[in-house]
Amino acid sequence: MSEIVFRRAGPQDVALVAAITDAAYAKWVPVIGRKPKPMTADYHAAIRDHLVELAYLDDAAVGLIELITAADHLLLENIAVDPAAHGQGIGRRLMQRVEQHAIEMGLPVVRLYTNKAFATNLGFYRRLGYAIEREEPYKEGFTVYFAKAVGKP
C-alpha cells in the first residue's frame, strides 16, 4: 500500500470533509433511522475550532479525523473513511495518527464515542485497545464512550 499523507483541512475543504463524512456514515442511517451526528455537523466551525486532518492515498482524499484538545485527553470527535477505500487499513492508520497527536501534545489518553448500534465500530475500537468507559442514553439509542491510555500522565 502507498503511504498515507495527512494535510490539515482549511476553509476550502468544508465540502470535501462533509462529502467524506456523509459517504462514511450513510450506511448507518437505516440502522438508527436518522442521520448520525457527524452528518449534521457544522464543518465550517469544526475546521475553524478543531484539528481536522484529511488523509490522502495516491493523491485522493480517503479519510479524515477531527480532534478536540481537552485538559487531560484528546477527543476523537470524528473519524471517517471513504467506503471506496475500505479494506486498505486506512481506519487503523487514522487511529495511529490520532494516538500520535495525543503523545506529541503530552496528553495521556485518547477518548472517543460512538453509537452502540454501530457494531463494527465497537469491535474496531476494542481491537485497537480502547476500553469502554460508560454508556449513556442518546435519542433512541445509546452512546458508548471509549478511552485508551497512550502516553505518560
Go through the PLM ranges and name each one.
Residues 18-49:
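Conserved GNAT-fold acetyl-CoA-binding loop/helix
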Residues 54, 60-68, 75-80:
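Conserved beta-strand in the GNAT
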Residues 9, 79-81, 114:
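Hydrophobic adenine-recognition pocket in adenosine-nucleotide-binding enzymes
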Residues 64, 68-73, 87, 115, ...:
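A short, glycine- and basic residue-enriched loop/turn
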Residues 81, 87-100, 126-127:
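Conserved acetyl-CoA-binding loop-helix of GNAT-fold acetyltransferases
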Residues 4-19:
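A short beta-loop-alpha structural element at the N-terminal edge
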Residues 44, 52-53, 108-131, 135-153:
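C-terminal "cap" of GNAT-fold acetyltransferases
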Residues 16-20, 42, 93, 97, ...:
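Alpha-helical elements of Rossmann-like donor-binding domains used by nucleotide-donor carbohydrate transfer enzymes
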